[in-house]
Amino acid sequence: MTAVSLGMPAVPPPPLASRRASRQIMVGPVPVGGGAPVSVQSMTTTLTADVNATLQQIAELTAAGCQIVRVAVPSQDDVEALPAIARKSQLPVIADIHFQPRYVFAAIEAGCAAVRVNPGNIRQFDDKVKEIAKAAGDAGVPIRIGVNAGSLDKRLLAKHGKATAEALVESALWECSLFEEHGFRDIKISVKHNDPVVMVRAYRQLAEACDYPLHLGVTEAGPAFQGTVKSAVAFGALLAEGIGDTIRVSLSAPPVEEIKVGTAILESLGLRERGLEIVSCPSCGRAQVDVYKLAEEVTAGLEGLPVPLRVAVMGCVVNGPGEAREADLGVASGNGKGQIFVKGKVIKTVPEGQIVETLIEEALRLADEMGAELPDELRSLVGGATVTVH
């Protein structure tokens, strides 16, 4: 029988545009730019001087899939903690420096993988560029020129009237030119704004004006929901155009949540191999099962499953069979029962009360066949063990 295409997206979908050509820098062992995969990073929320707490949070970020971590360095106590953190961290550490240029040199000496400088608030920054360029160049440490709308140089604010896209780009390119005068080009740039529209305009201009790798970010994006929406809109627009080499989602939430959102954005654009993906319908008057409950229970039951698996949880016979058939695993529900699909074929029909248990068992079986290293709590369920649904 001839296969019929249902017009479903490829898994993963192809990128929407070719990546922008850029220089490549190395942040520790992580390549940024030059065609390297887009990396996901975050920033610790601990007091950096509290070495144990900071390293614990870095360990949590590592487990969540973070690739680069940034730590704030506002005080001498934080500076003194940097050597231990840089040495023991599982991730390359970027020191985030404001106000004090001497902290830049201390961070380089401490073994940090990179240093972020804010040209808008470091005292006499332009006068220190020659020394910073030499120290960073000798140590092989890249510099991120991190321009932020909230701390833009007063001269540029006076010139442009406010923190426009043009003002952000002008600040970044000016500082780049100072480093270039001293032969230093191991640079990446960010031009962050809390308005996604201004941010997108700024990065588009920057992408046209230089070939440095770009760190994407919406600054002060807000609480989890609002920040997720802003970041997804801005990052999606730019990454779909091939712009962006590393991303940091800024949320007023635990840093691990930033990694989850950032990774999901990349997966959605085909820039990262998909992990577990739950496809579920929004429900409507046609639904004859509680789709919300089913989707939540399947998601909870498969949390931590380390495989690129698409699971469809559908509530009626209109779109349900098509979605379920195109997924790796799925259910089309109706009349108090569910048809279970695996790789496009119906393998069984089960009562509504067994849908979640069956989907979880089949997902774990597929993961096991793929050679996945399952967490102990999931591996114990492979082979038909009872699944407890809460």
Swiss-Prot record:
Its EC number is 1.17.7.3. Its cofactor is [4Fe-4S] cluster. Binds 1 [4Fe-4S] cluster. [4Fe-4S] cluster binds at residues 281, 284, 316, 323. It is an enzyme of class 1 (oxidoreductase). One of its GO terms (biological process) is terpenoid biosynthetic process. One of its GO terms (molecular function) is 4-hydroxy-3-methylbut-2-en-1-yl diphosphate synthase activity (ferredoxin). CDD domains: Aldolase_Class_I (cd00945). Keywords: 4Fe-4S, Iron, Iron-sulfur, Isoprene biosynthesis, Metal-binding, Oxidoreductase. The keyword Iron-sulfur applies. It catalyses: (2E)-4-hydroxy-3-methylbut-2-enyl diphosphate + oxidized [flavodoxin] + H2O + 2 H(+) = 2-C-methyl-D-erythritol 2,4-cyclic diphosphate + reduced [flavodoxin]. Pathway: Isoprenoid biosynthesis; isopentenyl diphosphate biosynthesis via DXP pathway; isopentenyl diphosphate from 1-deoxy-D-xylulose 5-phosphate: step 5/6. Belongs to the IspG family. Converts 2C-methyl-D-erythritol 2,4-cyclodiphosphate (ME-2,4cPP) into 1-hydroxy-2-methyl-2-(E)-butenyl 4-diphosphate. This is 4-hydroxy-3-methylbut-2-en-1-yl diphosphate synthase (flavodoxin). The gene is ispG.
